């Protein structure tokens, strides 16, 4: 009996095993025999895998199994070897976390991505698809067909983006290799320097602080840099070839250990020079460099911290002795002062002069060296003719020029004002003791195409306009509604036949919506009112109701349509709300913080103010919202930080992938799904979808997918296109990051068909239409395009570029260690913004209500954001609105006279380019 059961069981078990064999191998073995009279070439275990009828027979007294003639062989599923090769290539490399999640779900009776996988198999023709119904043989698209789809403008644009992305990737690899090669030497040099300094034997906390500093460097090196955009990475690269002669002179002096004061007008490249100095000092000289600034906005621009946080003096209140006690109680603050070798302070013009004297006293006491700043190399950067210093908390800010002059008091002929009368840092005794070498940057990079505008800005900077410059600014004046009637009546009475002002272009919200100018205001209240006015006029009507940080509910809109109601209006013209995700970096001695902290800051890092970031805390977007892009997309195309565009639609990342991959198959007969995606994205044609730039990838998504061999929407998972970090950031921005559970599908396993519809709707990202500048409409590259086959010469580019905006991050640094991070879409509403927020940006079209400015230099900062005079619009301009501080003007007059003498003296002591080659002995010069 047992033998009979065994005989029946064995063939069945073999047949089950054969069913698990790869379909391609089974098909090749079964289909070798094509003639009916030819015996099948199947042997061994494969022959026994056929379905057969078993009959018991007698053999040697035992029951056996007699196998009749087998039925015709099974027809293998129709599947191409090319598809299987591509699936193995794209689907391989699952992470360990994905494997663990998949194993848990299998044990619980679920299969990861089963529905999406079956959908993909049916769409690929695996499960008996009929010819002409979407099978694999009918929809295969080769490279030649792709080339025919894309026009020449799109090809040229995609090629430029590809070359720029490859260049960034190659430079990033070089930077990582150089950093890895320099790490062991850097530790050795630090130990040697600390032994020379001889402070470890005098103070007990130094050894502990050195250990913590080394651990902090290791943690900073291990921090994930995935949040950095390509523009942030480019800012850390050596750029010696792009520096002007004045900038190269400042770099040589900095590498020789001199104390510097770098100044110049707006757009002269001060921030660019600071980044290059930091890069050279850290990588070539192995120096411990701390980059600081007087404001949080300026600190983010130079990737540093505020000077108050570095010094450990909180708000800087109190006398020097009280601040010194605070610093000595903070082990970290004291350690920063001891090990700092180069201190860079940006926007020195906005620092309280008394604070500079206090910092000098603290540095001398902590370092126990009776030298200016305890022997630290000090590099100051700023322009005293721009925004004035920030007053202390117990002093009101100056409102008018008359109040400023009244507060100055005293005899203007005195060389040294009383301490209570100090207004700028150059009036302090510490400034004189530093023996700063002044480097004035004269070349303007921002307005290099408009020489007349440069002359106007130079005169506006010192507060004295010539008649020609005044007429040029008056020609850009627009009368506001409140003063249009009074000005018209005044001109009629006076018979004024002078320059006629421009017409008011923003009489209605609809007209303002089409306008490209960004209003620069003096206060936050004006900005909020203007942005809310025009945002509420868009469809759907109303303003968003932002949820509290502790509220786990989804975003609600100000209209009747809630976040959970799915209507046609919500789908095509939605109201999307994104809340920034703020987090602190972990440290061994500090509690780990990885949750949202938008309502406050940690006591251990009170200096971090997330509202200082240009990335907004809450970002509400509709179709038609005017936005400003806060990261560089393409330097060659002029799509840089500060470019203004308009939101035209919203798509989920995988929906955009589906749209791009559907286009080749639906170029003749578009489907309803393809038309729906094209309409939801706000793209007029398929060519616009081809050249849509993904900010996460840095190039055209169509080009990127073609290089990866991804041709079908069913083959594109989230992991093979974007990755885990991209998905995690999006979920956090829409409030879904905390809903992850053990049974959730891993982001690398997600296909579009496996995501819940409500999650697809909430996690859609904006598509922004950006206008190329007039100088970027053509490309005159000498090299031929590889794939496109273009000849040498100019090629015309499209006037509009569409960008798919992905999350980005701003980081706060203490030295070279990131301490806090804000993640948000690099966009902000751009109907209006404050002058302080616009500092450091390049805005193409600017509108300025100059009659409302109250601080000296505020009008100059606002107008210098633009690149051309023709792109400026002034409201109620008059000559009284332009003024500069008399003390600052006198200071720069002296600097201009001494500049020539300093250059002659420096030329006699500098010698050759030894500093750039790294041959000089930097440490000896500083310590002596």
From Swiss-Prot:
<protein>
    <recommendedName>
        <fullName>ATP-dependent DNA helicase PIF5</fullName>
        <ecNumber>5.6.2.3</ecNumber>
    </recommendedName>
</protein>
<dbReference type="GO" id="GO:0043139">
    <property type="term" value="F:5'-3' DNA helicase activity"/>
</dbReference>
<feature type="region of interest" description="Disordered">
    <location>
        <begin position="481"/>
        <end position="513"/>
    </location>
</feature>
<feature type="binding site">
    <location>
        <begin position="264"/>
        <end position="271"/>
    </location>
    <ligand>
        <name>ATP</name>
    </ligand>
</feature>
<comment type="function">
    <text>DNA-dependent ATPase and 5'-3' DNA helicase required for the maintenance of mitochondrial (kinetoplast) genome stability. Involved in processing of minicircle Okazaki fragments.</text>
</comment>
<keyword id="KW-0496">Mitochondrion</keyword>
<dbReference type="GO" id="GO:0006310">
    <property type="term" value="P:DNA recombination"/>
</dbReference>
<feature type="region of interest" description="Disordered">
    <location>
        <begin position="176"/>
        <end position="231"/>
    </location>
</feature>
<keyword id="KW-0347">Helicase</keyword>
<keyword id="KW-0233">DNA recombination</keyword>
<dbReference type="GO" id="GO:0005730">
    <property type="term" value="C:nucleolus"/>
</dbReference>
<dbReference type="GO" id="GO:0005654">
    <property type="term" value="C:nucleoplasm"/>
</dbReference>
<comment type="subunit">
    <text>Monomer.</text>
</comment>
<feature type="DNA-binding region">
    <location>
        <begin position="858"/>
        <end position="877"/>
    </location>
</feature>
<feature type="region of interest" description="Disordered">
    <location>
        <begin position="29"/>
        <end position="141"/>
    </location>
</feature>
<dbReference type="GO" id="GO:0016887">
    <property type="term" value="F:ATP hydrolysis activity"/>
</dbReference>
<dbReference type="GO" id="GO:0031981">
    <property type="term" value="C:nuclear lumen"/>
</dbReference>
<keyword id="KW-0378">Hydrolase</keyword>
<keyword id="KW-0547">Nucleotide-binding</keyword>
<dbReference type="InterPro" id="IPR010285">
    <property type="entry name" value="DNA_helicase_pif1-like_DEAD"/>
</dbReference>
<keyword id="KW-0067">ATP-binding</keyword>
<dbReference type="GO" id="GO:0005739">
    <property type="term" value="C:mitochondrion"/>
</dbReference>
<keyword id="KW-0413">Isomerase</keyword>
<dbReference type="InterPro" id="IPR051055">
    <property type="entry name" value="PIF1_helicase"/>
</dbReference>
<keyword id="KW-0809">Transit peptide</keyword>
<dbReference type="GO" id="GO:0005737">
    <property type="term" value="C:cytoplasm"/>
</dbReference>
<keyword id="KW-0227">DNA damage</keyword>
<dbReference type="Pfam" id="PF05970">
    <property type="entry name" value="PIF1"/>
</dbReference>
<dbReference type="GO" id="GO:0033567">
    <property type="term" value="P:DNA replication, Okazaki fragment processing"/>
</dbReference>
<dbReference type="InterPro" id="IPR003593">
    <property type="entry name" value="AAA+_ATPase"/>
</dbReference>
<feature type="region of interest" description="Disordered">
    <location>
        <begin position="389"/>
        <end position="421"/>
    </location>
</feature>
<feature type="region of interest" description="Disordered">
    <location>
        <begin position="585"/>
        <end position="607"/>
    </location>
</feature>
<dbReference type="GO" id="GO:0043137">
    <property type="term" value="P:DNA replication, removal of RNA primer"/>
</dbReference>
<dbReference type="GO" id="GO:0000723">
    <property type="term" value="P:telomere maintenance"/>
</dbReference>
<dbReference type="InterPro" id="IPR049163">
    <property type="entry name" value="Pif1-like_2B_dom"/>
</dbReference>
<keyword id="KW-0238">DNA-binding</keyword>
<dbReference type="GO" id="GO:0003677">
    <property type="term" value="F:DNA binding"/>
</dbReference>
<feature type="compositionally biased region" description="Polar residues">
    <location>
        <begin position="550"/>
        <end position="566"/>
    </location>
</feature>
<feature type="region of interest" description="Disordered">
    <location>
        <begin position="545"/>
        <end position="572"/>
    </location>
</feature>
<dbReference type="GO" id="GO:0005524">
    <property type="term" value="F:ATP binding"/>
</dbReference>
<feature type="transit peptide" description="Mitochondrion">
    <location>
        <begin position="1"/>
        <end position="49"/>
    </location>
</feature>
<feature type="region of interest" description="Disordered">
    <location>
        <begin position="898"/>
        <end position="928"/>
    </location>
</feature>
């Amino acid at each position: 009996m047992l033998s009979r059961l065994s005989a029946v069981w064995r063939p069945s078990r073999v047949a089950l095993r054969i069913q698990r064999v790869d379909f391609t191998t089974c098909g090749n073995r079964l289909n070798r025999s094509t003639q009916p009279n030819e015996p099948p070439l199947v042997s061994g275990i494969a022959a026994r895998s056929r379905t057969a009828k078993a009959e018991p027979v007698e053999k040697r007294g035992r029951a056996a199994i007699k196998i009749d003639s087998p039925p015709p062989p099974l027809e293998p599923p129709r599947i191409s070897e090319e598809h299987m090769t591509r699936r193995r290539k794209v689907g391989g490399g699952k992470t360990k976390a994905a494997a663990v999640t998949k194993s848990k779900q299998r044990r619980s009776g679920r299969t990861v991505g089963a529905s999406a996988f079956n959908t993909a198999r049916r769409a690929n023709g695996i499960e008996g698809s009929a010819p002409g119904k979407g099978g694999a043989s009918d929809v295969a698209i080769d490279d030649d067909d792709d080339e025919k789809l894309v026009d020449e403008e799109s090809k040229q644009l995609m090629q430029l983006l590809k070359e720029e992305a490859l260049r960034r990737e190659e430079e990033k690899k070089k930077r990582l290799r150089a950093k890895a090669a320099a790490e062991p030497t850097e530790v050795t040099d630090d130990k040697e320097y600390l032994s020379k300094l001889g402070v470890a034997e005098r103070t007990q906390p130094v050894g502990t602080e050195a250990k913590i500093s080394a651990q902090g460097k290791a943690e900073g090196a291990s921090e994930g840099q995935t949040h950095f955009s390509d523009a942030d990475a480019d800012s850390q690269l050596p750029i010696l070839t792009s520096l002007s002669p004045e900038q190269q002179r400042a770099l040589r002096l900095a590498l020789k250990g001199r104390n510097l004061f770098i100044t110049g007008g707006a757009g002269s490249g001060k921030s660019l020079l600071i980044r290059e100095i930091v890069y050279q000092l850290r990588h070539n000289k192995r120096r411990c460099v701390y980059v600081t600034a007087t404001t949080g906005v300026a600190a983010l621009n130079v990737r540093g911290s505020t000077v108050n946080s570095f010094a450990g003096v909180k708000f800087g209140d109190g006398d020097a002795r009280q601040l010194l006690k605070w610093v000595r109680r903070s082990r970290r603050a004291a350690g920063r002062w001891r090990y700092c070798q180069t201190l860079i302070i940006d926007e020195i013009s906005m620092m309280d002069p008394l604070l500079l004297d206090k910092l000098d006293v603290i540095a001398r006491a902590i370092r126990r060296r009776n030298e200016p700043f305890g022997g630290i190399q000090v590099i100051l950067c700023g322009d005293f003719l721009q925004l004035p210093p920030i007053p202390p908390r117990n002093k009101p800010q100056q409102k008018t020029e008359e109040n400023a002059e009244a507060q100055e008091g005293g005899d203007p002929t005195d060389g040294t004002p009383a301490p209570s009368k100090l207004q700028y840092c150059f009036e302090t005794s510490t400034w004189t003791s530093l023996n700063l070498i002044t480097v004035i940057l004269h070349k303007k990079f921002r307005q290099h195409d408009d020489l007349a505008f440069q002359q106007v800005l130079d005169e506006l900077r010192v507060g004295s306009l010539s008649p020609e410059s005044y007429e040029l600014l008056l020609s850009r004046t627009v009368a506001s509604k409140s003063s249009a009637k009074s000005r018209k009546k005044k001109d009629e009475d006076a018979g004024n036949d002078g320059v006629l002002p421009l017409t008011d272009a923003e009489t209605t919200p609809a007209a303002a919506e089409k306008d490209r100018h960004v209003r620069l205001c003096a206060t936050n209240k004006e900005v909020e009112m203007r942005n809310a006015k025009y945002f509420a006029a868009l469809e759907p009507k109303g303003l968003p109701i932002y949820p509290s940080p502790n509220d786990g509910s989804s975003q609600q809109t100000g209209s009747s349509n809630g976040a959970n109601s799915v209507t046609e209006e919500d789908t095509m013209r939605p109201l999307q709300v994104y809340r920034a995700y703020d987090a602190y970096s972990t440290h061994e001695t500090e509690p780990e913080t990885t949750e949202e902290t938008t309502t406050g800051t940690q006591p251990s890092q009170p200096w971090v103010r997330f509202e200082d970031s240009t990335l907004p805390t809450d970002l509400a977007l509709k179709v038609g919202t005017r936005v400003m892009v806060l990261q560089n997309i393409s330097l060659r195309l002029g799509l840089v930080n500060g470019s203004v565009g308009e939101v035209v639609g919203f798509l989920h990342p995988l929906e955009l992938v589906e749209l791009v991959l559907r286009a080749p198959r639906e170029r003749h007969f578009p489907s309803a799904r393809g038309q729906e995606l094209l309409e939801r994205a706000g793209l007029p044609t398929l060519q616009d979808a081809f050249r849509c730039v993904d900010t996460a990838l840095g190039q055209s998504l169509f080009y990127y997918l073609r290089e990866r061999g991804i041709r079908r929407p069913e083959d594109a998972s989230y992991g093979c296109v974007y990755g885990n970090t991209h998905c995690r950031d999006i979920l956090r921005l829409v409030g879904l990051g905390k809903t992850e559970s053990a049974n959730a599908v891993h982001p690398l396993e997600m296909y579009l068909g496996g995501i819940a519809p409500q999650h697809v709707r909430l996690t859609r990202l904006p598509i922004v239409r950006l206008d190329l500048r007039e100088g970027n409409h053509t490309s005159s590259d000498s090299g031929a395009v590889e794939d496109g086959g273009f000849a040498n010469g100019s090629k015309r580019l499209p006037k509009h570029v569409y960008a798919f905006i992905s999350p980005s991050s701003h980081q706060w640094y203490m030295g070279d260690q990131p301490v806090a991070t804000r993640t948000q879409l690099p966009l902000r509403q751009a109907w209006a913004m404050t002058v302080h927020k616009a500092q450091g940006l390049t805005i193409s079209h600017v509108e300025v209500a100059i009659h409302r400015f109250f601080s000296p230099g505020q009008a100059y900062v606002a107008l210098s954001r633009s690149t051309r005079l023709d792109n400026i619009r002034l409201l109620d301009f008059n000559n009284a609105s332009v003024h500069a501080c008399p003390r600052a003007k006198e200071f720069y007059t002296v600097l201009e006279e001494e500049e020539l003498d300093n250059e002659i003296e420096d030329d006699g002591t500098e010698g050759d380019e030894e500093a750039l080659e790294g041959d000089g002995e930097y440490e000896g010069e500083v310590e002596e």
